[in-house]
Amino acid sequence: DPELKSLIQNTNYCIVDSKHKISLLEDYAEKKLPIVDITPFDTRADFGISQQLTVQNILVPIDTIEQSKFEELIVLFASYFETNETARVHFFTRNANWDRVDSVLNFTREVLKVNGLDERLARKETNDKAEFDLDEEKKVPIKFFVDQCVDELSISKCIREQRIMVDVTARPDLYLQISCISSAIPQIVSFNTQYVHDAKNGFIVKEVSEVLNGLKYYLDNITNWNKCMIYSYELGKEYNTASLIRKWKGVMKQVEQD
């Protein structure tokens, strides 16, 4: 769009929500620009309740995930369950469709079946007591869940119960990344942003297969998880309300001078 390009080229100031977008915008405008990155979300120290739970919840955003990566993740998690009985996967979706939960679980079961794995790991939760009277069912606890979160309140409640986030989508969810910093939980991501520092508050992976090492590093070793919690707490200070206000004041002052 020539009009948009001209507008950006002649602007006095640009605001982006993360540092990685600075180079993208300058490449588009074909010139250096007066840009500052300010996250649209602030951090609020809220360490959640994951340490109080008897299970280790793994949050996995899926709304923009490639199907091949989704399939690979499902198989990887099923394999990880064999060595970590307390691990539980929570597929995260903002999709409010009435059949979203069923469609995700159906897909998960199909992938498990095709790969010779127990599809009961992804059966739907039910209040029907008759199901649990069966000895066989008791031996196979549900390990795949779908968290359908359509507002900030439900997302916040969901994050508080997670032990780690695994996001291998091509577009990072900044709200989730900031929320993970607030809750001080590790993040395994495939997209490099300033909110995840490799080997500090998470890992940046190139291949889905690398996720397994990250899970073992943080979920099988409480010391590593605690180090991440401390680092996340310090990192969160860079994006708290006071820090964002200072940045905005700096922008306003610069604009007034121009």
Describe these PLM feature segments.
Residues 3-33:
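A short, active-site helix/loop in glycosyltransferases that binds the activated sugar's phosphate group
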Residues 12, 157-172, 185:
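Acidic donor-binding loop of glycosyltransferase active sites
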Residues 15, 51-69, 74-78, 89-92:
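Conserved donor-binding/catalytic core segment of Leloir-type glycosyltransferases
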Residues 20, 37-47, 95:
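Short beta-strand->alpha-helix junction loop in the catalytic core
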Residues 102-150:
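Nucleotide-activated donor-binding/catalytic signature segment of Leloir-type glycosyltransferases, i.e.
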Residues 217, 224-238, 250:
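A short, well-ordered alpha-helix in the C-terminal region of glycosyltransferases
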Residues 241-258:
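C-terminal alpha-helical cap of glycosyltransferases
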